[in-house]
Amino acid sequence: MDRSKDARKRSISLACTVCRKRKLKCDGNKPCGRCIRLNTPKECIYNIDKRKDKRKIKNGSKVFLFKNNTIDNGNNSILENKGLNEDLSSHIYEKEAPKFDSDIDISRFGTNDAVIFNNDGWDTSLPIDFDFDEFNTETTDFDDFLKLLGDNSPSKEQKSLSYSPTATGLSGVVKETESEDNAPTRSRLIDVLFENKLHSVPGISKWHLYELESQYPNLECTEGNSDEKFLLSTVLCLGSLTIRKRELLNHSNIDNRPLLPENSISKLTTDAFKYYNAAKTLVPDLLSHPTIDGFCGLVLMANFMTMMISLEHQLYLSINALQLAVALNLNNNTKCKELLESNSDGIGVILLFWNIWCSSCMLATIHGKNPFITLEQITTPLPCEISPRNKTNKLLIDFMQIRIKLATLQSKIFQRLYTSSTANEVPFVNLEREFEEVSLQITRLKGFPIFEEHLFYRSRVLMLELSCLRAQASFLLYRPYLITGESLQAVTMAKSIIHEIWSQYTKQFPDNEKERHERLDWNFCYPLRTASLTLCISCIILLRYKQVVQFLKGTELFEYILALEILQDLVQVLPIEQNLIDIIKYPISPVQLSGDSFVEFWGRILY
């Protein structure tokens, strides 16, 4: 028997198909308010609800209970449903996106805040032409070089007596710690990059560097190939910086006596400065004549320049390295196969490409910029496809595979949630699913059994790196919901990663500092930069959280204090990271900024 029209009306679905698909609240009108705002009134359709409805009487009123929903039959009050006995932990595994309040204008917030940026004139494009003369050390100021290295800089009164910097190096040095006989030879500086077989510089042959070292006794001469001299200069600079940083850290851990005699400068420091300037003058030649040596050298330069230039300049330097890679067709599968056949170091060159690509994706997205090149534009063989797998390098290959997935995910998140102007599709659920899958892979990799000492300590660095990159992806994913107050997942992740970084770097456990000093190698800048960046963004998120929660405004969050503690310690290794501490302690309005896209992008959370 047919039901009455009233019964049919009661059985209509509570939400239209548009709101139901988006998993958002619906006011039940036809068309509903949300479809009117989205200019899709024709798509506002209500399906028949085939679920069994149960009539209940409470407080003299008849109400219908549709499973988990409690709807008043005459007024707008929501009745408490005490008949549900569901497992609270089941909510953890729900795949739904955080629901927006129907009062929020989805055209402004929605699931992407590209509209927010566009209204404020935010530019997500990358100016890929980078002027190398804009480096912090463009004036070849040796005082600045000493400070960025964390070396003991002579006073200005001693400056005229102790050294006289020139455009290409130093002259007139009065005193140096090492004599010419006792100072590390150039071959020793090369060896530093290859002393750990588990973590030597990929793509570069030590024997090739020995040949260049004997071929170019004077790097300032105009004869020879620019790319070869550039590669040798960057290797020698990085070797000098690594040994000198070890000396500085080990000395500071022993006593407070002066490391150098008065008016003296370490020859390692002066050599590093000399090699840096020699490499810098050759960069324009690299960009106009791309070669494998030039590409490898520029990737190394991007490594040690981490401690000398701003984050934005680091981004553009990595883009220049990628430009060389694209010019060499390192993003092309066919050309890479030819490289593997013709070059014995081809595998390492491809690994260098993936490393600099991952780094550039991370730097681009945290600056609110589109990546220079996406994975869809790359057919380069993955590390797992070209590297021989054994027990020793399985961990390293798996690390690279997950790192590439995280870089890809960060790029997807930024493009779909921040750049795309499409408002008809909600990609958040798929992105969140990808994020959870990568997180699971990281968790499994952390359980990889390791019983060799060197591999164990190496894995600690790699796993923390993955945790930091995962946290950064999470911050990008949940940032719009933090702004609208619809989810605190970013806050949860911020607290978690701060604890993880603190446990590995805090000086409250002496073994942490001992491990960092004893195992400091040529790549010491990258992991510390990643940790510092993650701590900085975490603190900004916690500051936003305090703004939202009124009763927390006058208190200091425990994790915030831990993060500042670690940042203060890391500044002792990378003094340039003091900029990140200043961003946290002295936040300024984005309208007062002078083009620092990192501060502008994350500072918008606080205003």
Curated annotation (Swiss-Prot):
Task: Say where the protein is mainly found.
Answer: nucleus
User: Which Gene3D superfamilies has this protein been placed in?
Assistant: Zn(2)-C6 fungal-type DNA-binding domain
Q: Which GO terms describe its molecular function?
A: DNA-binding transcription factor activity, RNA polymerase II-specific; RNA polymerase II cis-regulatory region sequence-specific DNA binding; sequence-specific DNA binding; zinc ion binding
Could you tell me the keywords of this UniProt record? DNA-binding, Metal-binding, Nucleus, Transcription, Transcription regulation, Zinc
Q: Which Pfam families match?
A: Fungal_trans, Zn_clus
Q: Tell me the Gene Ontology biological-process terms attached to this UniProt entry.
A: DNA-templated transcription
Q: Where does it reside?
A: Nucleus
| Taxonomic superkingdom | Eukaryota
Task: Kindly provide the name given to this protein in its UniProt entry.
Answer: Uncharacterized transcriptional regulatory protein YNR063W
